[in-house]
Amino acid sequence: LNDKNFWDEALKILNIKYHVNNIENIPLYGPTIFVANHPFGILDGLILSSIVSNIRDDYKILINNELSKIDHIKEYLFPIKFGNKKEDVIFNISSKNKSINHLKNGGCLITFPSGEVATSKFIFDQPNERKWKPLIGSIIKKSEPKIIPVKFFGQNSKLFQFVGFFNNNLRRALFIRELLNKKNETFEVQIEKSIENLNIKDLSNHEISDNLKSIVDKIN
């Protein structure tokens, strides 16, 4: 796949299409962070990267380290590890600082602040995301970018939810299956206007992330 069009080409191979509402809300330049919900997994990243890469070429993606092994896209990624080892913390501080510097230099950053795909708490419940990571609040506080909320509509299969209820590692193993079972479908994405009324300086990192999750959850 051609590096520049990796996201578009990957979606084309899968015959996955998307419809974007209010794409004009994406700033054409300047520090910008996209905060998106995470209902599907790999597909969310493919679609949002496709959207943003067709408007701006100064984008990076804050991404789970498990998904950062593809040579074609490594240059666009700031990987994050979700372990508790000392080396994981050091690794994440590096990616966090790179993200902050990228935004301060006028770039844009794609994020999925939950760090985990939405899943059901109980077998027959609707899938929900975990609390968003305070890391996003910290990045925003130190770089002061425009904040663009993004909402994907839909959810993964009942099998994915069922397996996730019992075994989180097995649920992760189903990510590729979930991507492939969405072939030939069209997905809707809502891009909201930049958030202007969030008093970043008066909020903790946790409060910033909680507020942003609430804003995205309410998009319909």
What is the role of each PLM region?
Residues 1-35, 45-47, 56, 74-75:
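Membrane-anchoring hydrophobic helices of lipid-metabolizing enzymes
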Residues 9-15, 85-90, 125-126:
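Short, flexible loop segments at the rims of nucleotide/cofactor-binding pockets, characterized by
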Residues 14-20, 90-93, 171-173:
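Short gly/ser/thr-rich secondary-structure transition/capping motifs
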Residues 33-35, 79, 110-112:
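Structural motif
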Residues 38-42, 117-118:
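Gly/Ser/Thr-rich loops at beta-strand to alpha-helix junctions
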Residues 46-52, 125:
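"Short basic amphipathic alpha-helical interaction patches in structured regions
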Residues 53, 58-92, 96-99, 103:
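Conserved nucleotide-cofactor-binding alpha/beta core module
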Residues 93-220:
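Non-catalytic C-terminal accessory region of glycerolipid acyltransferases
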